[in-house]
């Protein structure tokens, strides 16, 4: 199996056929022995170092070198820029070895065009099966029998009815087969605007639209080649529309590319799909696929582009109320009027509360002005209660001062003096009370003695 040419830049071009067409090339390869160019004394590191620095390719894996050797132009743009001019367009000897020398004249190679948009887990198997069937058609005997099992498996919808044609039909259908997938795939010039075609395209024989035999052969042979990126068969027992195959085989300007995630949704639809209908169905079934469009390009018909623009505008208009619902800066329509809280304030001013009244609970402020008014009202009530408490305390001190004999005439007595004199006066009153209690006891004892004397005098 020949490997990549490493004449110009040996350190940059891969030598592993399985990792050649990966979009993310590993920095180091285990099979490279001449990576270090320091000299004969330099020794490569061990296997653990290679495993540490190896960058694993991301899935899906690229096709093997055995199935893309006949490719006239590489699919990876970085590899294309690094390849030399001689190796960029393939080796004619290798193409002749496979019996596909005619592929060199086709600028849009169907294998690369179909392989440039891998999608799904079975893309590699479909590509290998398509290339193997091409090789069988190219090497087949003159008396070709019924269709091969691979072709039957790739065409369960009955598109392989052209496989029963004779050797002449197979030989005539081979160039059309190789040119047919290019019409169904995306042109690289649309995706990559830089000029990459180095050769002039060879003239491709076009089958007339009026011959049903040749059209059937083209339709049957083109089905396995387009299985890599085209949609799967619509219904198992329903044959495909022959007119659509004729239009696709004779028109090189129309392109069609359907992704694998749309295959399940488009099983009951025809091959030509209205974009507006697809948008309505996708928007109703999956609410997240708002900006996802079905890739159906018809340059001759400009009505589909207008329909796509109108559908996208409709979808964007549907999303507008959702953004408006989450606009927290907008004023809420459920805010009550600001006339109710001032009525409570007027009520509190008209009927003042008593001394130990409970302050009404604070209402939810709807504006800064209402919050300021409530704060001032609360401060005013607090001042009133504090003033009443101070007046009561002052009147109590004045009453206490009036009861102290030393401070009756002193109107400017301080509160501390009033408290001290009142304490001394209380202590003096308590001492006087104690003396009076002792005198009372003496008097009661004297009374008892006198009563006894009176009784003795009466008995005598």
Curated annotation (Swiss-Prot):
Which Gene3D superfamilies would you find in this protein's record? Helix-loop-helix DNA-binding domain (4.10.280.10)
The biased composition feature labelled Acidic residues covers 255-274
Residues covered by region (Disordered): 131-169, 221-288, 330-388
Per the record, where are the segments of Low complexity compositional bias? 138-158, 221-233
Q: Where is this region: Interaction with AURKA and FBXW7?
A: 61-90
> Which InterPro entries does the record match to this protein?
bHLH_dom (IPR011598), HLH_DNA-bd_sf (IPR036638), Myc_transcription_factors (IPR050433), Tscrpt_reg_Myc (IPR002418), Tscrpt_reg_Myc_N (IPR012682)
Q: How is it modified after translation?
A: Phosphorylated by GSK3-beta which may promote its degradation. Phosphorylated by AURKA.
One GO term describing the cellular component: nucleus
Output the superkingdom of the source species: Eukaryota
List the molecular function annotations (GO) for this entry: DNA binding; DNA-binding transcription factor activity; protein dimerization activity
Where does the record locate the signal sequence feature? none
> Where does this chain mainly localize?
nucleus
| Record carries keyword DNA-binding | yes
Q: List UniProt keywords, sorted A-Z.
A: DNA-binding, Nucleus, Phosphoprotein, Proto-oncogene
- Positions of post-translational Phosphoserine modification: 257, 259
How this chain assembles, per its entry, is:
Efficient DNA binding requires dimerization with another bHLH protein. Binds DNA as a heterodimer with MAX. Interacts with KDM5A, KDM5B and HUWE1. Interacts with MYCNOS. Interacts with AURKA; interaction is phospho-independent and triggers AURKA activation; AURKA competes with FBXW7 for binding to unphosphorylated MYCN but not for binding to unphosphorylated MYCN. Interacts with FBXW7; FBXW7 competes with AURKA for binding to unphosphorylated MYCN but not for binding to phosphorylated MYCN.
Tell me the function of this protein.
Answer: Positively regulates the transcription of MYCNOS in neuroblastoma cells.
Query: What does the record's free text say on domains?
Result: The 9aaTAD motif is a transactivation domain present in a large number of yeast and animal transcription factors.
This one is known as N-myc proto-oncogene protein
